[in-house]
Each structure stands twice: as C-alpha cells, then as structure tokens.
Amino acid sequence: MSKATKRKHVVKEVLEDYVTPTEDQQIMRVLGSNGNNLHEAVTGSGERFLLSMPTKFRKNIWIKRGDFVIVDPIKEGGKVKGEISFILYRDHIQHLRKLGVWPEGFQEDRTSGERNEGTQKERSEEKEEEEGDSESEDDDSDLFVNTNRATVLYSESEEETDEDEEEDKGRA
C-alpha cells in the first residue's frame, strides 16, 4: 500500500468511524507533546500519563493541546502508560455525550468552552462591523508588502513624452 493510500484510509477511519471506549480504554485530554511521538495527557479524574502515538497516526493525523483521545492502557509501561487508539473530534465527542459515556471530569469543560465560543462570536461580529466601516475608505496600509522584491517607483511626466515626440518629429 502506498503512503498516500495509507494516509487516505487512516484519515477516513478517524473522521468517519464512531468508536465507544471498551472497559479497558479511557478517554483522556492531551496536555501537550513531549516529542518522539509521546504526548502528556490527563484523565477525567486528574491523573497524568505519558501516551505513545502508534505508527499508523504518525505524520498522518495531528494532535494538539486540548484534543481528546481514547487510550489503550499499557500495563508493563514504566513512564509511558498508554497508547492512543483513537482521536476524538467534535462529532465524536457529541456522540459519546449522547451515549452517556463521556467522563464527568470533562463535563464542566463543555460549559466553559461554550461560554468562550459565545464571547468569541461577539468579538468577531464587532470586528466585522469595524472592518465594514474601514472598507469604505481606500486604505492600502494594511496590505502585505513583499520585502523580497526591490521597490521601483515609476514616475511618468508629460514633459518627457512631449520632448520625445518633438525629437521624433524632428528626425522624420
């Protein structure tokens, strides 16, 4: 199987499959990446663990701080105590909440997240209104300037063109 085909199947599996954790598995929130495909995560009860990312997800699926994952425990692990088996996105989280499988420790984060989303929407609406006012003015000062190109100023004056025309007429 080529890399592109493998990536396609892994992404399709992560986005389309709805998985519920088994008795051994648990849902955890990623706190950050420690490098070498190790991620620090916390359970709903507040316990912190190091998790390893399996090779099928490496360079195919990205995990950032605050994402939720389903973890298979590693019983013989010293520092690394779990392996990520599934990455949860918004639709998966809503599905797990409907089933009543979502951990109680993460329930409170939902309400604070919704509050933050509401304030962010209000701020974005205010910014759009401010931008709407500035759009009526033709101000190009906020445009990106490419510093990798030399700035060339072209100045054409009518005097030069008149002189050129007179010289051309004199030659003819």
UniProtKB/Swiss-Prot annotation:
GO terms for molecular function: RNA binding; translation initiation factor activity. The keyword Membrane does not apply. Residues 127-142, 156-172 have a biased composition (Acidic residues). Residues 107-126 have a biased composition (Basic and acidic residues). Keywords: Nucleus, RNA-binding. Pfam families: eIF-1a. PROSITE patterns: S1_IF1_TYPE. InterPro entries: EIF1AD (IPR039294), NA-bd_OB-fold (IPR012340), RNA-binding_domain_S1_IF1 (IPR006196), TIF_eIF-1A (IPR001253). Residues 107-172 are annotated as: Disordered. May play a role into cellular response to oxidative stress. May decrease cell proliferation. Belongs to the EIF1AD family. This is Probable RNA-binding protein EIF1AD. The lineage of its organism: Eukaryota, Metazoa, Chordata, Craniata, Vertebrata.
